[in-house]
């Protein structure tokens, strides 16, 4: 099965009341761990590349890794997606370079500018059967080149979503309901809360339309504990409870983005391995267990 766009994935997810996992990839071990797990589960998957990952690992290396994953896992649908594309130029480069889905992130721009740029991306991408995601509202937190202070974060205005989707022609919409990028999503002692009222209103205004949640890592406590046990310093890392993600998936969310959990899994595994095996220096010895941690 060749790379696919997200149209059929999201149609089935919406009808089935579940969300497709979208995982940020930076290297071979992450790609292998994710796709091996999804292959065993017979689950569709979105492998997404941020502008920072593309700069770090190179467009060609990443696309070839994903192509290899497609060959190794022929029975599952795999989409290759650009995460947080800040410009038409980058989105176009990814469309031209074999991506099957792109996100234009104009959430920091004035509304009309966001509309105009998203429409431009959609018009170009659709010529090549590439699906397009856009964003309304701004998530707090840090992810590669995306830096938004808590006081600058904005919840999505449900009153804008119909106009935005109609005028841009995008295929899915990322909204801000209280998730955030990074491993510090809530303050210590703060009860995790998401604005499900906004999600409900958006889904009413856009019936059947795929919604996306960014910044949705659970920040698995086991990984944080291991990192801190072996020399790390992440005392206040808090993520999104899994039950909230399941609830969102039953309310029109068809794509849930995961990045921090992958970083935590790899870091915890590598720290533990090197602490317990101080004489080892072959990267395969510690990256192999890290790959397994990603898969598990």
What are these regions (language model features)?
Residues 229-232, 240-296:
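C-terminal alpha-helical cap/extension of soluble enzyme domains
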Residues 4-12, 27-53, 59-75, 84-210, ...:
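Alpha/beta enzyme core
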Residues 217-219:
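Gly/Ser/Thr-rich loops at beta-strand to alpha-helix junctions
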